[in-house]
Regions:
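Core-facing hydrophobic residues within beta-strands of well-ordered domains
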Residues: 22, 196, 341-343
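Conserved AMP-binding/adenylate-forming
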Residues: 197, 206, 210-298, 316
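AMP-binding/adenylate-forming catalytic core of the ANL superfamily
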Residues: 169, 272, 277-379, 404
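Structured loop/turn residues at beta-strand edges in well-structured enzyme cores
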Residues: 16, 164, 194, 220, ...
Length: 466
């Protein structure tokens, strides 16, 4: 993906940067043989290089991508494993500093001296460390409060935001949903009672409808952060809501899923990344596994760098009613349906014959089923209103010190856990009192009954729909 007028898009400069990456990568076990003798005389030479897959990374082993001596490496990280096997990356201090500097340069109003950043990114993930580094470089005051942290459960995080007057909440997309529900339970309006003016969110799909809902609930600007464990930072969104790629850090190609050819403006395809600024674990033509859509034209914000919309992982695409749906499309439609009844708490279950969207209702007068149908025309769907606390038990969540990376969609047609609520995938259950046990048991019984009814429907469905 290149854009006229952007320095890194100059063919000569880009070719030199790609050649430098190939030279660095050759020092790793992963690329030692496959890049032997490779010389790039043109961009066409580069585009003929084979793709690197996640399977290649896994077969290379934890140390396989490391191209720098251990003496120069300061940071090791692993992917969460939500997409399969774990991948690793080794980073130098310069690798971290370049990503941090790019974020601060792209978002100067968000990260500035004196601004307080409540850093809720899990500390096994790179964004948490980038937030700390941005603060150390003069971009604010960071509060290290990772959400997978026994010391800072959700209630304490909310209290920290109140006490410190935090202006930036940085974390996974569900973080402001959970904190907003806890604030609501305590009679606190996040818009009026907190100083947060920016939600800096990444690590999971952040569809437009959810961005709108969160922005309205918090009275804050929503910024999307995009990257991966393997590639580090790939981009952040502008004020026009477009996700701009960091062309100084990575060269990105968008290739047609069927033909492998580059797609034009407005086209969809798999994202292939070559890192330009990583010394520790450089990567050449990595298929990151995501499907993106290129912007159809120049962005209204004036930024000439290419912009994309992340549609979801290619392997997570769902075939239903003759249509191929990306996870982001489904989650976006579900978020809009929930917003129609003044809620941000929802969970999607993919069944053989339909989508089931479960929504904690808040008394809004909209028609969530109509909204869902308008967003996903022709897709069989059902909206199930449930009582507050059925999908996200705020009280129980407040007592649980251990919270996992959340999911809002579960495909019951595939092997694995059949999740029905947000809480099932997030919480390590604490010891219950008698009152807690009675309340939890009643909720669990209702959920179990619903699960059995849905499972019975799976058994009765025609074989061809499974």
């Amino acid at each position: 993906v290149t854009t006229p007028g952007v320095p890194t898009a100059s063919p000569d400069a880009l070719l030199a940067a790609l050649e430098a990456t190939v030279a660095r990568a050759r020092a790793s076990r992963l690329y030692a043989e496959r890049l032997t003798g490779v010389r790039l005389r043109s961009l066409a030479d580069f585009e003929r290089l084979p793709l690197t897959t996640r399977r290649d990374l896994q077969e290379a082993g934890p140390d396989g991508t490391r191209a720098a001596p251990r003496e120069r490496v300061c940071h090791y990280q692993e992917s969460s494993g939500t997409s399969g096997a774990v991948n690793s990356a080794w980073l130098t201090a310069g690798d971290l500093e370049r990503s941090a500097a790019a974020i601060r340069a792209a978002q100067p109003e968000t990260f500035a001296p004196g601004r307080v950043i409540l850093n809720r990114f899990p500390f096994m993930a790179a964004p948490a460390h980038l937030m700390q580094l941005i603060a150390q470089q003069g971009g604010g005051i960071a509060i290290p409060a990772g959400n997978i942290n026994w010391d800072v459960p959700f209630p304490r995080a909310l209290e920290l935001a109140e006490r410190t007057g935090a202006q930036v909440l940085a974390g996974l997309p569900l973080e402001p949903v959970v904190l907003g529900e806890i604030a609501r339970a305590r009679g606190l309006d996040p818009r009026a009672g907190l100083a947060v003016d920016t939600l800096f969110l990444g690590g999971a799909p952040l569809p437009p409808a959810l961005q709108v809902r969160l922005g309205r609930t918090w009275g804050a600007r929503v910024i999307e952060l995009y990257g991966s464990t393997e590639t580090m930072l790939l981009g952040t969104s502008c004020r026009a809501g477009m996700l701009h790629l960091e062309t100084g850090l990575a060269h990105c190609e968008v290739l047609d899923l069927a033909t492998g050819a580059a797609v034009g403006p407005g086209g969809e395809g798999r994202l292939v990344v070559t890192t330009l600024a990583l010394e520790g674990s450089p990567l050449v033509r990595l298929d990151v596994g995501d499907v993106v859509r290129r912007a159809a034209g120049p962005c209204a914000c004036g930024d000439l760098r290419p912009a994309v919309t992340v549609l979801g992982r290619a392997e997570d695409a769902i075939e239903l009613a003759g249509r191929r749906l990306h996870a982001s499309e489904i989650v976006d439609a579900a978020a809009a349906a929930a917003d129609a009844v003044d809620s941000a708490v929802f969970f999607v279950v993919v069944l053989p014959d339909r989508l089931l969207v479960r929504i904690e209702t808040r008394g809004g007068r909209g028609d969530p089923a109509a909204v869902l149908a308008s967003r996903l025309p022709g897709v069989p769907s059902e909206v199930e209103p449930v009582a507050a606390g059925m999908l996200l038990d705020v009280e129980m969540l407040c007592r649980s010190p251990h919270v996992y990376k959340p999911v809002v969609l579960s495909d019951w047609r595939r092997p694995g856990r059949r999740i029905l609520t947000l809480g099932e995938g997030m919480i390590e259950w604490p010891r219950l009192t008698w009152q807690d046990g009675r309340r939890w048991l009643g909720r669990a019984v209702r959920t179990a009954r619903r699960r059995r009814r849905l499972a019975r429907g799976l058994r009765l469905a025609p074989v061809g729909t499974r």
